[in-house]
Curated annotation (Swiss-Prot):
The keyword Flavoprotein does not apply. This is Large ribosomal subunit protein bL32. Belongs to the bacterial ribosomal protein bL32 family. Coiled coil: none annotated. One of its GO terms (cellular component) is large ribosomal subunit. One of its GO terms (biological process) is translation. SUPFAM superfamilies: Zn-binding ribosomal proteins. GO terms for molecular function: structural constituent of ribosome. Keywords: Ribonucleoprotein, Ribosomal protein. Pfam families: Ribosomal_L32p. It comes from Xanthomonas oryzae pv. oryzae (strain KACC10331 / KXO85).
Length: 64
């Protein structure tokens, strides 16, 4: 069984935990469709930075 060599002080414990805080997700709005998406990710419609980069099933059905 692992046993620590010496007791960890509250200050040291707090310094270790200082990087564990949760942050809110960064969201962006696409200029073409106005859809909200994660930064640096394409939208559900297949747009990235205002340009169509991938054909999705929903857009293929609408075009037919």
């Amino acid at each position: 069984m692992a046993v620590q060599k010496s007791r960890v002080t509250p200050s040291r414990r707090g310094q270790r935990r200082s990087h564990d805080a949760l942050t809110a997700k960064q969201l962006s709005t696409d200029p073409t469709s106005g859809e909200i998406h994660l930064r640096h990710h394409i939208t559900a419609d297949g747009y990235y930075r205002g340009k169509k980069v991938i054909t999705t099933k929903s857009s293929a059905v609408q075009e037919d």
